[in-house]
Every structure is written in C-alpha cells, then in structure tokens.
Amino acid sequence: MAVRGANTLTSFSIQAILNKKEERGGLAAPEGRPAPGGTAASVAAAPAVCCWRLFGERDAGALGGAEDSLLASPAGTRTAAGRTAESPEGWDSDSALSEENESRRRCADARGASGAGLAGGSLSLGQPVCELAASKDLEEEAAGRSDSEMSASVSGDRSPRTEDDGVGPRGAHVSALCSGAGGGGGSGPAGVAEEEEEPAAPKPRKKRSRAAFSHAQVFELERRFNHQRYLSGPERADLAASLKLTETQVKIWFQNRRYKTKRRQMAADLLASAPAAKKVAVKVLVRDDQRQYLPGEVLRPPSLLPLQPSYYYPYYCLPGWALSTCAAAAGTQ
C-alpha cells in the first residue's frame, strides 16, 4: 500500500510494522508482500499481488511474473542482492525498522498526503480498488496488534484527513463557532443597549444648603407677603433683583411662607371647633386669709386617755363591736 505524492510514491509505514512483526515471529514473508526495504518501484507492482491475496484470482504464473518484474527493475536488482524470498534473515534490516527511518517515512507520508489533498482533494478519492481491498485486509489483521503498533498505524492516516476538516463534523463545528462568533458580534450593540437600559444605582443626593437671609431681606419679604400672597414671574424677578436674591430663592421662600400660614390657620380652626371644658363648682375649704387651727389647739398636749377604736381604725374598717360602741356613745351624747 502506498501514498501517492506530488511526483513519487512513498511506501506506507504499516507495511514496515507488519514485516517487523513477522520477522520477530520467525515467519517467512508472504509471497504477495514486499520485504522490508522495498522501494517505490517494488510498491508500484504491489497492487496485483495484494489483489491476488484478497480475491485469490491470480495464479502462480502471474505471481511469478510479478516477481520477475520486481527483480528486473533497477531498484529490485539493488535490493535483491542481500535477501531471498524464503529467508527473513537475508532482508535488509536498516530499511524501515529503526525509529529514525520510521519518522522520516511518516514525514514523507504527510508531505505526500498534503500534496495529494491540494491537487485532487482527499486521498481516498484517488486510491485504486486493489489498494482499498488491501486496506480492508490490513484492518482485519489489526485486531491482534498491540497499542504501540495501532498508534503507529493511525499516525500515518492523520495527515490526509486534516484537509477535509472543513467538510466533516469537526468542520461543521468550526463553522458553527464562526457563525456564533459572527452572531455575537452582530448582537454586540444590542447587548450594549440592554446594559445601558439597566437602571444605574441611585447616587446619594447632595444635601442642599439653606439660604441665610438677612434681617432686611426677611423684613421686605414679609411685608410683600402680607400685601400679596402670590407673585407673577415679572414681579418675582423685580423683587429678587431688589433684594439681590435669585428668583428660585424668592419662589421657595413664598412657598414655605404660604405653607406655614396654612398650618397656623388649621391649628386655630381646630382649637375653635373643640368643645369647651365642663365647669364644676367646687366648695373652697381652705382660704388663704383664714387659719385652720387656733393657737391654743396646736400647742395642746395629747390626751392620756386610751384611744377609742374610732381613732386608730378607719370608719369603713371598724369591727362590729367597735361600731356598736360608737353608736352607743353617740346615743348618750
């Protein structure tokens, strides 16, 4: 299997990996597969052999003719000196088994694939039928490979697919991102307008300083207010100019003065409409010009007689016997 470049054919790295696996197992190279170190000419004749391996439609004579053509080519004569078809030990071990040659081969595959993609699109469009069949055969054999061999085989197929990223799902994703970016750019002014529509945080209002009027200004304003409660525009302008004030100051003073007058009037109306307090006649017991006690009574010493219950008990708290005693004493008097 080969990748067609701009001018030359470059062998595929999967072939070298398979040959290396067979060499480690001590197996002979199959008749339809070129030995390691095969050149572009040897790979060019591989379609017929691989088609025979897949479909079994070619005979030994055709296979022998293919081998004769391989040996007859200049590259075949150069590589056939150190190997035979039956002995793996005679193969060239420096062809594609080292990591350096493997990396060079991958770079060559990438360059060839990019050239093929630029010239005619994808690599899969220009592959022959036998190469497609061989690739299917390799996919069937890849089931028993190790992880390292699978990664090496996949690395050779990545470069041609990069040209078709714009067509596949990844390309659709990129186009969607681009369209989304374009839509976002188109909706940018709308987003800015929405942000502008949002109400800003209310700024704290600066406390306005009160205007200090002089006594002369207050006197003139009071005199004009008693004469005229409301001022027109020209009258307010003349009064402000005469008092060296602004029209706004004069207007605010008249508004406050009217409100103050209205509150006073409302308070007076409430007092007038309130019912009068009820008057009650109270007997005057003590007068300022009269004495309550005589001078002799105040200086009299207390009597030594035992106190009656009526003296140290309130009338409503006296017991029954005390009440009867008091009643009897009152009756005797």
UniProtKB/Swiss-Prot annotation:
Gene Ontology annotations for the cellular component aspect, listed alphabetically: chromatin; nucleus
UniProt DNA-binding region: 206-265
Annotated compartments: Nucleus
Biased composition range(s): Gly residues: 180-189
Keyword 4Fe-4S tagged: no
This protein's UniProt keywords: DNA-binding, Dwarfism, Homeobox, Nucleus, Repressor, Transcription, Transcription regulation
Record flagged with keyword Cell division: no
Bias (Acidic residues): 89-100
GO biological process: animal organ formation; cell differentiation; determination of left/right symmetry; embryonic skeletal system development; intestinal epithelial cell development; middle ear morphogenesis; negative regulation of apoptotic process; negative regulation of chondrocyte differentiation
InterPro entries listed in its UniProt record: HD, HD_metazoa, Homeobox_CS, Homeobox_NK-like, Homeodomain-like_sf
Any one Gene Ontology molecular-function term assigned to this protein's record: DNA-binding transcription factor activity, RNA polymerase II-specific
Tissue expression pattern: Expressed at highest levels in cartilage, bone (osteosarcoma) and gut (small intestine and colon), whereas moderate expression is seen in trachea and brain. Expressed in visceral mesoderm and embryonic skeleton.
Biased composition annotated in UniProt, kind: Basic and acidic residues: 138-148
Region (Disordered) residue spans: 65-113, 138-212
Start-end of Low complexity biased regions: 75-85
Disease involvement: Spondylo-megaepiphyseal-metaphyseal dysplasia: A skeletal dysplasia characterized by disproportionate short stature with a short and stiff neck and trunk, relatively long limbs that may show flexion contractures of the distal joints, delayed and impaired ossification of the vertebral bodies, the presence of large epiphyseal ossification centers and wide growth plates in the long tubular bones, and numerous pseudoepiphyses of the short tubular bones in hands and feet.
Protein family according to the UniProt entry: Belongs to the NK-3 homeobox family.
The protein's role, per its UniProt record: Transcriptional repressor that acts as a negative regulator of chondrocyte maturation. PLays a role in distal stomach development; required for proper antral-pyloric morphogenesis and development of antral-type epithelium. In concert with GSC, defines the structural components of the middle ear; required for tympanic ring and gonium development and in the regulation of the width of the malleus.
Name this polypeptide is given: Homeobox protein Nkx-3.2
Native source species: Homo sapiens (Human)
